[in-house]
Structure formats: C-alpha cells, structure tokens
Amino acid sequence: MAIRIVGVDLPQNKRGEIALTYVYGIGRSSSAKILDKAGVDKDLKVKDWTDDQAAKIREIIGAEYKVEGDLRSEVQLNIKRLMDIGCYRGVRHRIGLPVRGQSTKNNARTRKGRKKTVANKKKATK
C-alpha cells in the first residue's frame, strides 16, 4: 500500500528520512524534525510505517510546513513581485540572466540557454 502525503506517493523501500524529501519543500533536516516530532524512527522504511504514524506525519506537515503547490505558488509570486517593482533582481529574472551576481562573460549557460551563433562578416571584395 503506497503512502501518500500531500499528493506525493512516497517510495516504499526507502528510509523515512529520505522518502519525505520526495515532497517539494521538505529536505533532509526538515524530514528529520518531522519524524522526531511524530515519534517515528528515521531509519524505519516507509513500508513498515503504521497507519497511525503516517497520519501523524501528514498532520504535522499540513499544520507546520508550506509544501508542494502552495510553496511553488508562493515562490512564483515572490519572483513576480520582484519583476513588478522593477528592482535589479526582478530585471535579471525578466531578461533571463543570473540573479545572484554571477559573471556572464563566459558561462551562465543554464540561465541564458543554448548559444546563439553569430555569422561571420564576409570580407569585402575589391
């Protein structure tokens, strides 16, 4: 039986601490805190969780963490706000360049996309 938390099926054969990181917005440290608060051993595999343990974890995540769609929409709204107020970071987002001060002379290919090749000028014939 697959355990579903906030719309994500957790992998059955992984430890609980790792399996919870499949949820967007929960990393290793957050998953360890959640499992401690729920009283579940973090080395216990997901398939060995009881229904009560899964329900307790669901309850903790729902009450204390912003995850999946809510978190994604909040991040998008934050980026949109930066773009609307026209600050430097918003402008960098709008034109698709690195936002955190990285150099763009040579690299930054992830943000800029594939190279746009420029044709050479033809030599003028006399």
From Swiss-Prot:
Q: Which domain of life is it from?
A: Bacteria
- Stretch list, region Disordered: 98-126
> Does this entry carry the keyword Cytoplasm?
no
Q: Where is the composition biased (Basic residues)?
A: 108-126
A Gene Ontology BP annotation from the UniProt entry: translation
Query: Which PROSITE patterns does the UniProt entry name for this protein?
Result: RIBOSOMAL_S13_1 (PS00646), RIBOSOMAL_S13_2 (PS50159)
Ordered alphabetically, the record's keywords are: Ribonucleoprotein, Ribosomal protein, RNA-binding, rRNA-binding, tRNA-binding
InterPro entries in the record, alphabetically? Rbsml_uS13_C, Ribosomal_uS13, Ribosomal_uS13-like_H2TH, Ribosomal_uS13_bac-type, Ribosomal_uS13_CS
Q: Name one GO molecular function term.
A: tRNA binding
Which Pfam families does the record cross-reference, listed alphabetically? Ribosomal_S13 (PF00416)
The Gene Ontology CC terms held by the record are:
cytosol; small ribosomal subunit
Family under the similarity heading: Belongs to the universal ribosomal protein uS13 family.
Note the subunit structure. Answer: Part of the 30S ribosomal subunit. Forms a loose heterodimer with protein S19. Forms two bridges to the 50S subunit in the 70S ribosome.
Described function: Located at the top of the head of the 30S subunit, it contacts several helices of the 16S rRNA. In the 70S ribosome it contacts the 23S rRNA (bridge B1a) and protein L5 of the 50S subunit (bridge B1b), connecting the 2 subunits; these bridges are implicated in subunit movement. Contacts the tRNAs in the A and P-sites.
Q: What is this protein called?
A: Small ribosomal subunit protein uS13
Q: Which organism is it from?
A: Bacteroides fragilis (strain ATCC 25285 / DSM 2151 / CCUG 4856 / JCM 11019 / LMG 10263 / NCTC 9343 / Onslow / VPI 2553 / EN-2)
Gene name per UniProt: rpsM
